[in-house]
Amino acid sequence: MAPLDARVAGVTSERDERLGRLAAFPDVVAAAAHRAAGRPTPEGEWTPEQVVRHLIAVDLEVHQRRLRDLGAEEEPTWSWQEPGPWPDEPALGLDGVLGRFGAVRTDTVGMYHVLDDAGWARQGRHVTFGRLDADGLLRLAVDHDEEHLGGMA
């Protein structure tokens, strides 16, 4: 029984580390966005504000929606989604958008924190990635963050 307990503890520890990265990302992206804001944006690329607006849209339209789907449907099916920049509150500016992203991300992380064991075990089917449980969705969220952080480097 001890090896199983150690494995479960390891999985939980890895999940907690991913949740920590998800929660800390608003500060990480804020620093990167402020550094990038002083440089010209290459043609065809998003400005730092547009990247952060995109991250808001992804949290609202993808991450939070899929977590709600897991709670409401037996086995939800998800398509590939890559929303553009969040269009609301156009006058916010970079700092305002970063603040909004922090609030939205806090809500997303909160949705993960309220999951019980059954919630973490529920699964849906993604047309590209196959079966995903809540931890699989969390992995995708962290990977997506890192991808966009790299674009501001």
Tell what function each PLM region has.
Residues 1-24:
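Extreme N-terminal tail/first-helix region
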Residues 1-8, 38-81, 123-153:
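Short, contiguous alpha-helical
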Residues 10-13, 84-97, 128-136:
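Acidic/His metal-coordination segments adjacent to aromatic residues that form catalytic metal sites
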Residues 12-15, 50, 63, 102:
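Short alpha-helical segments used as structural interaction elements across diverse proteins
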Residues 15-18, 22, 44-48, 60, ...:
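Hydrophobic alpha-helical segments and helix-packing faces
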Residues 18, 52-56, 97:
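Short secondary-structure transition/capping motifs
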Residues 21-22, 26-32, 83-122, 141:
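Acidic/histidine-rich alpha-helical segments that form the ligand environment
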